[in-house]
Amino acid sequence: FPGNVTANVTYSLTADNAIDIKYDATTDKTTVINLTNHSYFNLDGHGAGSIEEHELWLRASHFTPVAAGSIPTGEIRAVAGTPMDFTQPKKIGRDIRDDYEQLLLTGGYDHNFVIDDWDGTLRHIATVKGPKSGRVMKAYTTLPGVQFYAGNFIDVQPGKDGVTYGN
Protein backbone atom coordinates (compact mmCIF):
# COMPACT_ATOMS: atom_id res chain seq x y z
CA PHE A 1 0.00 0.00 0.00
CA PRO A 2 1.22 3.52 -0.64
CA GLY A 3 2.55 5.87 2.00
CA ASN A 4 4.36 5.80 5.27
CA VAL A 5 2.39 5.26 8.46
CA THR A 6 3.25 6.43 11.94
CA ALA A 7 1.10 4.67 14.51
CA ASN A 8 0.86 4.97 18.26
CA VAL A 9 -1.08 2.91 20.75
CA THR A 10 -1.54 3.93 24.36
CA TYR A 11 -2.61 1.47 27.05
CA SER A 12 -3.90 3.02 30.26
CA LEU A 13 -5.33 1.60 33.47
CA THR A 14 -8.01 3.94 34.77
CA ALA A 15 -8.88 4.68 38.40
CA ASP A 16 -11.85 2.29 38.15
CA ASN A 17 -9.68 -0.59 36.83
CA ALA A 18 -10.61 -0.23 33.16
CA ILE A 19 -8.05 -0.87 30.44
CA ASP A 20 -8.24 1.96 27.93
CA ILE A 21 -6.61 1.35 24.54
CA LYS A 22 -6.31 4.33 22.20
CA TYR A 23 -4.95 4.23 18.66
CA ASP A 24 -3.63 7.09 16.58
CA ALA A 25 -2.14 6.95 13.09
CA THR A 26 -1.01 9.44 10.47
CA THR A 27 0.08 8.88 6.88
CA ASP A 28 1.77 10.91 4.19
CA LYS A 29 -0.44 9.37 1.46
CA THR A 30 -3.94 7.98 1.27
CA THR A 31 -3.71 4.35 2.34
CA VAL A 32 -5.53 1.58 4.16
CA ILE A 33 -5.04 1.23 7.91
CA ASN A 34 -6.63 -1.42 10.11
CA LEU A 35 -5.34 -1.09 13.66
CA THR A 36 -6.11 -3.84 16.13
CA ASN A 37 -4.64 -5.75 19.02
CA HIS A 38 -4.41 -9.38 19.94
CA SER A 39 -4.75 -9.27 23.69
CA TYR A 40 -6.14 -12.44 25.21
CA PHE A 41 -7.80 -12.61 28.60
CA ASN A 42 -8.58 -15.48 30.93
CA LEU A 43 -10.58 -13.73 33.61
CA ASP A 44 -10.11 -16.62 36.02
CA GLY A 45 -6.38 -15.91 36.14
CA HIS A 46 -3.05 -17.66 35.84
CA GLY A 47 -3.27 -21.43 35.48
CA ALA A 48 -7.09 -21.46 35.47
CA GLY A 49 -7.37 -23.50 32.28
CA SER A 50 -9.75 -22.98 29.40
CA ILE A 51 -12.02 -19.99 28.80
CA GLU A 52 -14.83 -22.29 27.67
CA GLU A 53 -16.73 -21.77 30.94
CA HIS A 54 -16.54 -17.97 30.58
CA GLU A 55 -19.89 -16.40 29.79
CA LEU A 56 -20.08 -14.02 26.81
CA TRP A 57 -22.70 -11.51 25.70
CA LEU A 58 -22.41 -9.57 22.42
CA ARG A 59 -24.57 -6.68 21.20
CA ALA A 60 -24.65 -8.31 17.77
CA SER A 61 -27.51 -10.07 16.03
CA HIS A 62 -25.45 -10.55 12.85
CA PHE A 63 -21.94 -11.68 11.93
CA THR A 64 -19.83 -11.78 8.78
CA PRO A 65 -19.27 -15.35 7.57
CA VAL A 66 -15.89 -16.43 6.23
CA ALA A 67 -14.66 -18.76 3.51
CA ALA A 68 -11.60 -21.00 3.61
CA GLY A 69 -8.61 -19.15 5.03
CA SER A 70 -10.93 -17.06 7.23
CA ILE A 71 -11.52 -14.54 4.44
CA PRO A 72 -14.87 -12.71 4.84
CA THR A 73 -17.38 -13.52 2.12
CA GLY A 74 -19.12 -10.12 2.20
CA GLU A 75 -22.33 -11.64 3.52
CA ILE A 76 -23.92 -10.39 6.73
CA ARG A 77 -25.77 -13.29 8.38
CA ALA A 78 -28.19 -13.41 11.33
CA VAL A 79 -26.95 -15.25 14.42
CA ALA A 80 -30.43 -16.35 15.53
CA GLY A 81 -30.72 -20.13 15.69
CA THR A 82 -26.97 -20.67 15.19
CA PRO A 83 -24.03 -21.34 17.55
CA MET A 84 -22.92 -17.77 16.74
CA ASP A 85 -25.72 -16.31 18.88
CA PHE A 86 -24.39 -14.51 21.96
CA THR A 87 -27.27 -12.01 22.15
CA GLN A 88 -28.10 -13.66 25.47
CA PRO A 89 -25.17 -14.53 27.75
CA LYS A 90 -23.88 -18.08 27.20
CA LYS A 91 -20.76 -20.09 27.93
CA ILE A 92 -18.14 -19.81 25.19
CA GLY A 93 -17.68 -23.58 25.13
CA ARG A 94 -21.36 -24.49 24.89
CA ASP A 95 -21.43 -24.59 21.07
CA ILE A 96 -17.76 -24.24 20.11
CA ARG A 97 -17.54 -27.85 18.86
CA ASP A 98 -20.86 -27.72 16.97
CA ASP A 99 -20.78 -28.96 13.37
CA TYR A 100 -21.90 -25.52 12.12
CA GLU A 101 -19.95 -24.82 8.94
CA GLN A 102 -18.58 -21.49 10.18
CA LEU A 103 -17.11 -23.09 13.30
CA LEU A 104 -15.66 -25.95 11.28
CA LEU A 105 -13.95 -23.50 8.89
CA THR A 106 -12.22 -21.65 11.72
CA GLY A 107 -11.79 -24.37 14.35
CA GLY A 108 -14.08 -22.43 16.70
CA TYR A 109 -14.91 -18.76 17.05
CA ASP A 110 -12.90 -16.34 14.89
CA HIS A 111 -15.50 -14.05 13.39
CA ASN A 112 -16.50 -10.42 13.10
CA PHE A 113 -19.79 -9.59 14.77
CA VAL A 114 -21.82 -6.63 13.49
CA ILE A 115 -22.80 -4.23 16.28
CA ASP A 116 -26.57 -3.72 16.57
CA ASP A 117 -27.85 -0.17 16.02
CA TRP A 118 -24.35 1.15 15.37
CA ASP A 119 -24.19 4.94 15.21
CA GLY A 120 -20.48 5.69 15.72
CA THR A 121 -20.79 6.66 19.38
CA LEU A 122 -18.96 4.85 22.17
CA ARG A 123 -21.16 1.93 23.19
CA HIS A 124 -21.04 -1.12 25.44
CA ILE A 125 -20.86 -4.04 22.99
CA ALA A 126 -19.66 -7.06 24.97
CA THR A 127 -19.46 -8.50 28.46
CA VAL A 128 -17.39 -11.52 29.51
CA LYS A 129 -17.56 -13.12 32.97
CA GLY A 130 -15.06 -15.52 34.53
CA PRO A 131 -16.98 -18.12 36.57
CA LYS A 132 -14.20 -18.98 39.04
CA SER A 133 -12.99 -15.47 39.82
CA GLY A 134 -16.22 -13.56 39.31
CA ARG A 135 -14.26 -11.02 37.27
CA VAL A 136 -16.18 -9.16 34.58
CA MET A 137 -14.78 -7.44 31.50
CA LYS A 138 -16.88 -5.06 29.44
CA ALA A 139 -15.86 -3.90 25.97
CA TYR A 140 -16.81 -0.58 24.40
CA THR A 141 -16.23 0.69 20.89
CA THR A 142 -17.16 3.40 18.40
CA LEU A 143 -16.69 0.97 15.51
CA PRO A 144 -19.32 -1.10 13.63
CA GLY A 145 -17.95 -4.54 14.48
CA VAL A 146 -15.98 -6.64 16.93
CA GLN A 147 -13.85 -9.71 16.22
CA PHE A 148 -14.38 -12.55 18.67
CA TYR A 149 -11.50 -15.04 18.63
CA ALA A 150 -11.49 -17.91 21.13
CA GLY A 151 -7.82 -18.80 20.67
CA ASN A 152 -8.49 -21.70 18.30
CA PHE A 153 -5.04 -21.55 16.70
CA ILE A 154 -2.87 -20.53 19.63
CA ASP A 155 -0.11 -23.09 19.94
CA VAL A 156 0.54 -24.43 23.42
CA GLN A 157 3.15 -22.24 25.10
CA PRO A 158 4.95 -22.75 28.40
CA GLY A 159 4.09 -20.14 31.01
CA LYS A 160 4.96 -19.21 34.55
CA ASP A 161 5.19 -22.02 37.12
CA GLY A 162 5.12 -24.71 34.40
CA VAL A 163 1.55 -23.82 33.37
CA THR A 164 0.86 -24.16 29.65
CA TYR A 165 -1.30 -21.76 27.66
CA GLY A 166 -2.95 -22.27 24.30
CA ASN A 167 -5.56 -24.35 22.64
Protein language model regions, located:
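An exposed, glycine/acidic-rich loop-and-rim segment of catalytic or binding clefts
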Residues: 1-167
